[in-house]
Amino acid sequence: MAGNFNQIEKIGDYTVITASMNYASTTQLLAKRGMDILGGLVGCIITLIVTIFVGPAIYIASPGPIFFAQERIGRNGRKFKMYKFRSMYMDAEERKKELMSQNKVSDGMMFKMDFDPRIIGNKILPDGTKKTGIGQFIRKTSIDELPQFWNILKGDMSLVGTRPPTLDEWDKYEPHHRARMSFRPGLTGLWQVSGRSNITDFEEVVKLDTQYINEWSVKGDIEIIWQTAIGVLRNDGAM
């Protein structure tokens, strides 16, 4: 089923040719979008219920907005606002620069730390003991990702796809890295269920994302959703 597919689209004031690494029929695309709409609706209802409990806990621990909106890169380089429950302190983005030397992904294409002090409640006590709070809890259980069901319902994202990079990560991409964004970004994906947060080699992420795009099928998406659900229940790592 794999194959290249190009189409002419309007992005802002520009008319451009966009590309897909895997051609899918209209029926297949409608099936995927149908899954997204259904999943998005159910997910938004769950998110509203969870907000009743998680929202106050976030605000008490770190006064400020309970939701976090960040500009991300979507399909074919489009920018969109991605939503999460706020799991970090308000100055997290500013502090990120100070912590880059501790980034587990050496090439800087993603940012991962073993114990991130920007997460709400995270602190190292004088005796070296590490203390966590609501921020670590909602990240470990992937509750912080729930607001992205709104992105899915809007069409910015899909239930399954490639994870959307931040603008600074996108600027560092080489041409073969950008190919992973020829598909609509997803809440979960192949690399998440292949190692979830444990993967620290960005080239491995690109390899798995490219494999997902080339071998995409509705059945494959269902399998990834199932594996993601099992991973979350087992606390295999944050999405």
Predicted features along the sequence, with ranges:
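A hydrophobic, helix-centered structural microdomain
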Residues: 26-95, 151, 218-239
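Amphipathic alpha-helical protein-protein interaction surfaces
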Residues: 50, 130, 142-143, 198, ...
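Glycine-rich flexible loop motifs, especially short His-Gly-Gly/GGXG/HXGH segments used as catalytic or interaction
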Residues: 3-41, 66-70, 196, 200-218
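Short, glycine-rich, amphipathic interfacial segments at transmembrane boundaries or analogous
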Residues: 5-8, 68-130, 188-209
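A short, structured surface patch at a secondary-structure boundary
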Residues: 108-183, 224-232
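Cytosol-/stroma-facing membrane-proximal "stalk/adaptor" domains immediately downstream
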Residues: 5-6, 162, 167-180, 184-185, ...
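Gly/Ser/Thr-rich helix-start
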Residues: 41, 56, 65, 75, ...
